[in-house]
Amino acid sequence: METLQHLILHDMPNSEEIEAVKSGDHTLTYKGYRKRINQLANAMLQKGIQKGDRVALLCKNGHPASTVMFAALEIGAVVVPVSWQLKPYEMTGILKASEPKAMFYGAEFKEILDEVLPELSSLCVTMETGTAYETSAEFEALFAGPDHLPETEMVSPDDTALLMFTSGTTGNPKRCMITHGGIYRYVKKSNSSIARMKGLRFLACHPIYHTSALICIMLGTFAETTFVFTKDQDPVHMLKVIEEEKIQTVMALPVFYTYLLEAWEKHQTDLSSLVILMTGGTKVPSSLISRYLDIGIPLAHGYGSTEAWGISTWTPDMGMDKAASAGKPVAGVKVKVEDPLTGEELPQGEIGEIVVHTPFLFKGYEDNPEATAKVLQNGWFRTGDSGYVDEDGFIFITGRYKDVIIYGGDNVYPDQVEEVIQQIPGILETAVVGIPDPLYGEKPKAFIVKNGGQRITEEDVIAFCKERLSAYKIPEVEFVNELPKNNLGKVKKDVLRNQAVHS
């Protein structure tokens, strides 16, 4: 059966020698990990959790979180990863909508859940797991039972495995139904990724509610990767973990790597164990990739979405001249560019909407057929991203369609302006949005976060841009302490637009 459940039941590693997960002082081999997953799966069945039931997961990165996830999937339950950045009001809304039967949560979230749990009439089982490093006695008691494979009802490839939430930058988050078959095909077709992760020591600092974090866990587990979990992303602590644990690969957002590099330049820890770093989730500045290559560390990045999972990847061996691209489609994925108004396929090099056909595609937004119909058309997924494919087959993303700035009839793509600004030394991150202009309709404005006490002026930024961009692309500049972001780490450009209009 081509399902993720079947993979967990029959193909999960069972080695007594290879370390599977490490949280603090606790280490499990794959054999011990396999045993605990089975024990928890059997305990879930005893508590009445069955195929199709929703199991919400609110835990910091650690072996309790991954064990709960695999145990639930093994019995055919639907895992609902919950962001720990949400406020009680937001969390209540998404959990009410997803109707979990069970909730597993870390001890640090007890206070927020005291407000949330009474609102959830669907809940039958609640379990505090302890912390990422120390499990609670109540949770540990679940592992006293049998460790044989659970006798459970088998799922079909079209059954939902994960209920993920979109970033919700334009309103309430939509619930993406990710199927067992889609994840199965992703694992089976990702031979090169699995080979690259085979036996590596992986620093699992990327929050487990991110799609990219889950992709790494799924692929890495079946590649016998060792996951060293950390519950936060403090760069100085991360450098220490990399050195002491001989970490070979990491997955994180681009801004994390900026902070990490700045910390390394101060502390000069040993990074010689690193083989490759991975990032994605937002545009990756070519300057950041170059800075890592300068110290001998390749930084690869990928393009994808919650709905489509991995779409394309770029690695340094593809050439720095393509570093600003989103790479080439992964195995099994087809990409075309269409006119968003007519649906006509556009020729090579022309900017339009990126549309993909992929065997890993979600099956729709739960209880939202209208939103589903807008993005799923004849087996193709409309990403909402504007971009083009060049003569070598590389995908270039120029922005979100709703983010494109129309300056007197000329299109300004925020990603292009952001890419230029990110090249300025001392810039931590930036976001470019369109603001009203009485003469041209819209004009670009850049919100910029400087790195520490760097002395960079508006004039410096504008002069730098004038050397590299057409006159109509030169933005207004405003320095800010931080950029507003949603719980997935994506910049909330609508907030910046409103801020600019009402300032």
UniProtKB/Swiss-Prot annotation:
GO terms for molecular function: acid-thiol ligase activity; ATP binding. Keywords: ATP-binding, Ligase, Nucleotide-binding. The keyword Nucleotide-binding applies. Pfam families: AMP-binding, AMP-binding_C. Its EC number is 6.2.1.-. The keyword ATP-binding applies. InterPro entries: AMP-bd_C (IPR025110), AMP-bd_C_sf (IPR045851), AMP-binding_CS (IPR020845), AMP-dep_synth/lig_dom (IPR000873), ANL_N_sf (IPR042099), ATP-dep_AMP-bd_enzyme (IPR050237). Signal peptide: none annotated. Belongs to the ATP-dependent AMP-binding enzyme family. This is Putative acyl--CoA ligase YdaB. It comes from Bacillus subtilis (strain 168).
